[in-house]
């Protein structure tokens, strides 16, 4: 079938298998060009492994180090004439490329928050890997069914204590708009922490440790975004910020647990990129469009694979890791360059409907958004029929 992009709001409801595969190959090629990652991990578990930063981590570990990988994700398979999700096709392509290079790859498809998927993952580690020496936690989800209480928690994107008015882009109409966000209630804050805080990461590490599948010296990291002044009302001072502070508290206990066996636990702070999650946040399309404009002009623009490849080389397995005062690994240094942030702030209130395409890189933002779903990738013939029914070999469900 011939598949074209169909966008509704912040979701593209179609995906292109060949485009997703080409995107995965591009990321592999980037890692290969940079050469081997020295002293890297050998057996890696990535929780949230099918898109964005999690996929990039799996690619960097496999093709930069030669690591065996186990990826956990929650994706929809293709059915009849309906394509699967982008993460499904990304993972299928990863398996194909890993097999071609003789790399061990296992995947588990299901709800990472559930005890069932944790148990299935542990069984797969025992069978295929024995133990893992790196656990990457890269889960982005709007809700979580708590495995112990059965309560479903819904995350909320709201400020705390007062309403906040945010500038942004109505991406459907390509117009500047303002959104008034009302303050979160205490229950909404608690629910957001339950979904996006550190509890599930801790549950994963506790389960892996109790099962004996964490190697001596194992490391774990959870990916997060903090941002700067422009985004702080939402990302640090809002309901999501409380979840991020919970992540910072959680990592201290995990660090103590792993340090007893020569290991380590860190929160890794990554730069703002286009993801399905970020595109749904009212201010982020405008912020990203301005950030792309400024960083591309300076030659410092990076995407997921550049960020995570650098994180592994420079910080997780580098001799001189970039660590902030709170002990987080920082890969977002170029975004937070004072000159970059000053220029973004300077342009923030100047953007109008008329100059949207000149003051910002909204065109680049839109292109990156479509790439998430396999569209706009160089070398792919989007007028040619493509087979949507792609399988993932040896998938555990």
From Swiss-Prot:
Q: What reaction(s) does this enzyme catalyze? A: a 2,3-saturated acyl-[ACP] + NAD(+) = a (2E)-enoyl-[ACP] + NADH + H(+)
Going by the record, the broad EC class of this enzyme is oxidoreductase
Looking up InterPro entries in the UniProt record yields: Eno_Rdtase_FAD-bd_dom, Enoyl-CoA_Rdtase_cat_dom, FabV-like_NADH_b, Trans-2-enoyl-CoA_reductase
The intrachain disulfides are: none
Q: Which domain of life does this protein belong to?
A: Bacteria
Active site per the UniProt annotation: 235
Per the UniProt entry, the Enzyme Commission number(s) are: 1.3.1.9
Question: Which terms are listed as keywords in the entry?
Answer: Fatty acid biosynthesis, Fatty acid metabolism, Lipid biosynthesis, Lipid metabolism, NAD, Oxidoreductase
State where substrate binds.
225
Whether Transmembrane helix counts among this entry's keywords is no
Molecular function (GO) terms listed? enoyl-[acyl-carrier-protein] reductase (NADH) activity; NAD binding; trans-2-enoyl-CoA reductase (NADH) activity
Positions of the record's site feature: Plays an important role in discriminating NADH against NADPH: 75
Q: Where does NAD(+) bind?
A: 48-53, 74-75, 111-112, 139-140, 244, 273-275
Q: What does this protein do?
A: Involved in the final reduction of the elongation cycle of fatty acid synthesis (FAS II). Catalyzes the reduction of a carbon-carbon double bond in an enoyl moiety that is covalently linked to an acyl carrier protein (ACP).
The molecule here is called Enoyl-[acyl-carrier-protein] reductase [NADH]
Native species of this protein? Burkholderia pseudomallei (strain K96243)
Highest classification ranks of the organism: Bacteria, Pseudomonadati, Pseudomonadota, Betaproteobacteria, Burkholderiales
């Amino acid at each position: 079938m011939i598949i074209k992009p169909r966008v509704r709001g912040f979701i593209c409801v179609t995906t292109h298998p060949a485009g997703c595969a080409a995107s995965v190959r591009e990321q592999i090629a980037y890692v290969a060009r940079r050469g081997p990652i020295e002293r890297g991990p050998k057996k890696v578990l990535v929780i949230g492994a099918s898109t964005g930063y999690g996929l990039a981590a799996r690619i960097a570990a496999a093709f930069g180090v030669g690591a065996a990988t186990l990826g956990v994700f929650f994706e929809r398979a293709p059915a009849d004439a309906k394509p699967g999700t982008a993460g499904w096709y990304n993972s299928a392509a990863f398996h194909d490329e890993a097999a071609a290079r003789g790399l061990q790859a296992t995947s588990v498809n299901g709800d990472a928050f559930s005890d069932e998927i944790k148990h299935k993952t542990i069984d797969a580690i025992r069978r295929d890997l024995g133990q893992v020496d790196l656990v990457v936690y890269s889960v982005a989800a709007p809700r979580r069914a708590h495995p112990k209480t059965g309560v479903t928690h819904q995350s909320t994107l709201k400020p705390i204590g007062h309403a906040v008015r945010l500038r942004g882009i109505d991406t459907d109409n390509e117009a500047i708009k303002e959104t008034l966000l009302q303050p979160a209630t205490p229950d909404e804050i608690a629910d957001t922490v339950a979904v996006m805080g550190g509890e599930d990461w801790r549950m994963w590490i506790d389960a892996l440790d109790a099962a004996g599948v964490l190697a001596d010296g194992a490391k774990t990291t959870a990916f997060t975004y903090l941002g700067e002044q422009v985004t702080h009302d939402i990302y640090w001072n809002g309901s999501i910020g409380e979840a991020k502070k919970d992540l910072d508290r959680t990592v201290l206990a995990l660090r103590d647990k792993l340090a007893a066996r020569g290991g380590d636990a860190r929160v890794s702070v990554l730069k703002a990129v286009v993801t399905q999650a970020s595109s749904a946040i009212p201010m982020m399309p405008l912020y990203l469009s301005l950030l792309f404009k400024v960083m591309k002009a300076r030659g410092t623009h990076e995407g997921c694979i550049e960020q995570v490849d650098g994180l592994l080389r420079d910080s997780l397995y580098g001799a001189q890791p970039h660590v902030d005062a709170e002990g987080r690994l920082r890969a977002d240094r170029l975004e937070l360059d004072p000159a970059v942030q000053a220029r973004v702030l300077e342009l923030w209130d100047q953007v109008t409907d008329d100059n949207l395409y000149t003051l910002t890189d909204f065109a680049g933002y839109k292109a990156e958004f479509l790439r998430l779903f396999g569209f706009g990738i160089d070398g792919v013939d989007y007028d040619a029929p493509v087979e949507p029914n792609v399988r993932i070999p040896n998938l555990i469900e």
